[in-house]
């Protein structure tokens, strides 16, 4: 536990310095690397085991991010941001109907991969936009990420300490309502 806390503190200091001091181009580039790791993890979580498929997914996201960066002042950039906003309520409705823990068929894995990409690419664009848009963009980026980090931390500790009532046992068995209240 001590090593986990020290690692978290070091990463937090690096992240805060990156957010507050780095130009948006460097911030975006570092996020590309973080997102590549996230895609690799996501493909593993959804049951994709073939390394070449996972690498292809990572490359697809990196290329999408590079392409978006090259058109960041265009309507395509804004279309991706709007699509990301529209995606979230649709995903919530979809999760009520679709069982993500369904049989691990190729089709289900492809759907899960697409769902992850619909979250990750717009989220990257949103953070980059927030960071570079206004003179206070760096502070707003820090505020947004601290809010997420705090909610995640409080959810973890509240869920670990008090968690009895499962939130969605078939989709995410470790999540519970007490964690939700801790996050809020």
Model-derived features: positions:
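Membrane-embedded alpha-helical bundles of polytopic integral membrane proteins
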Residues: 1-184
């Amino acid at each position: 536990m001590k090593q986990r806390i020290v690692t978290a503190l070091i990463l937090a200091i690096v992240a805060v310095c990156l957010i507050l001091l780095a130009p948006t181009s460097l911030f975006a580039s570092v996020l590309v690397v973080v997102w590549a790791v996230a895609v690799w993890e996501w493909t593993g979580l959804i049951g994709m085991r073939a390394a070449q498929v996972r690498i292809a997914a990572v490359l697809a996201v990196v290329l999408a991010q590079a392409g978006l960066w090259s058109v960041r002042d265009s309507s395509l950039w804004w279309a991706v941001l709007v699509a990301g906003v529209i995606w979230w309520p649709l995903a919530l409705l979809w999760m009520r109907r679709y069982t993500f823990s369904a049989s691990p068929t190729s089709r289900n894995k492809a759907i899960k991969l697409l769902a992850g990409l619909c979250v990750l690419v717009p989220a990257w664009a949103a953070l980059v936009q927030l960071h570079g848009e206004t003179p206070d963009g760096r502070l707003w980026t820090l505020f947004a990420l601290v809010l997420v980090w705090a909610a995640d931390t409080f959810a973890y500790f509240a869920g670990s300490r008090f968690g009895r009532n499962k939130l969605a046992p078939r989709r995410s068995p470790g999540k519970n309502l007490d964690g939700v209240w801790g996050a809020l």
